[in-house]
From Swiss-Prot:
HAMAP family: 16SrRNA_methyltr_H. It comes from Citrifermentans bemidjiense (strain ATCC BAA-1014 / DSM 16622 / JCM 12645 / Bem). Keywords: Cytoplasm, Methyltransferase, rRNA processing, S-adenosyl-L-methionine, Transferase. One of its GO terms (biological process) is rRNA base methylation. Belongs to the methyltransferase superfamily. RsmH family. It comes from the Bacteria. The gene is rsmH. It is an enzyme of class 2 (transferase). This is Ribosomal RNA small subunit methyltransferase H.
């Protein structure tokens, strides 16, 4: 696994947001290359604890190797963070001092041809984060009704040409199954008028994003995982979430805002009757983004947005 590479985005900003301390219990719900996890463990020495989750078996193997220097201070679990609250309850953890979620697809996943995430190389059309379960992208494009394909590409990819893309996919699969990434790329290119291709965006970008989100149920996982993690934060504990596209950022923004909302009674009422009090405060009113130096060193950080919330 020496070739596993992934540069964690906004590392200093995450560390500053969480302010890890000795004796604290922290969760990294998206271990990846263990970059954020290693920083948290180092900052929380000598006895801070970290519990890491990832649904990708390759990431789990790499994290175990890279974090073994921290010994018993780290526990690694191969599991989607959607079920994080239950997983923590199973190991006797009922409260945490901080958590981080980095929602980006790792450089390793994108660059490994056989994973099927990239439209730049030919590979089996897979896109599963956890290859031991669930349907692949090929399963979806070859079996879903045209209307459902349209919904996925439009809703998850925010693709203006979704209707044509879905129609062309169905026509192509009627001739032969779409089994590889470049097969799908050719179909997408044929469906979008070349004069309408965006200058700095590959024509397959939005459709590939949509299929990846659908295959891995990413938005559903985010909603469930975020709710579970917020419920476990101790007073003064902080949650930091890095998103990479508007759909994710909207869920995080609305989830944090709802948690930080107090009375919802109509303004004309003289007193509060709803009894709702804010449980959290927003540490970041606007998301933190990468600076010029980080973007130059790691172009994938360009679209990253970090939001932070604190339990009160």
């Amino acid at each position: 696994m020496e070739d596993f590479h992934h540069i964690s985005v906004l590392p200093d900003e995450v560390l500053q947001a969480l302010s890890p301390r000795s004796g604290g219990v922290y969760v990294d719900g998206t271990l990846g290359g263990a970059g954020h996890a290693g920083l948290i463990l180092t900052a929380s020495a000598p006895d801070g604890q970290l519990i890491g989750f990832d649904r990708d078996e390759e990431a789990i193997a790499v994290a175990r190797e890279r974090l073994q220097v921290f010994g018993g201070r780290v526990r690694i679990i191969h599991r989607n963070f959607a079920g994080i609250a239950q997983a923590l309850a199973e190991i006797g953890v009922d409260g945490i001092d901080g958590f981080v979620l980095d929602l980006g697809v790792s450089s390793h996943q994108l660059d490994r041809d056989e994973r099927g995430f990239s439209f730049m190389h030919d590979a089996p059309l897979d896109m599963r984060m956890d290859r031991s379960s669930g349907q692949s992208a090929a399963d979806l494009v070859n079996t879903l009704p045209e209307g459902e394909l349209y919904r996925i590409i439009s809703e998850y990819g925010e693709e203006r040409w979704a209707k044509r893309v879905a129609s062309f996919i169905v026509k192509a699969r009627d001739e032969r199954p779409i089994e590889t990434t470049l097969q799908l790329v050719d179909v997408i290119k044929g469906s979008i008028p070349k004069a309408k291709w965006e200058e700095r965006l590959h024509p397959a970008t939005r459709t590939f994003q949509a299929l990846r989100i659908a295959v891995n149920e990413e938005l559903k996982s985010l909603e469930e995982g975020l709710e579970g993690l917020l419920s476990l934060l101790k007073q003064g504990g902080r949650g930091a979430v890095i998103s990479f596209h508007s759909l994710e950022d909207r869920i995080v923004k609305e989830g944090f805002r709802a948690a930080a909302t107090g009375c919802t009674c109509p303004k004309e009422l003289p007193i509060c009757i709803c009894g709702r009090v804010p449980r959290f405060k927003l540490v970041t009113r606007k998301p933190i983004t990468a600076g010029e130096a980080e973007v130059a060193a790691n172009p994938r950080s360009r679209s990253a947005k970090l939001r932070v919330v604190e339990k009160i």
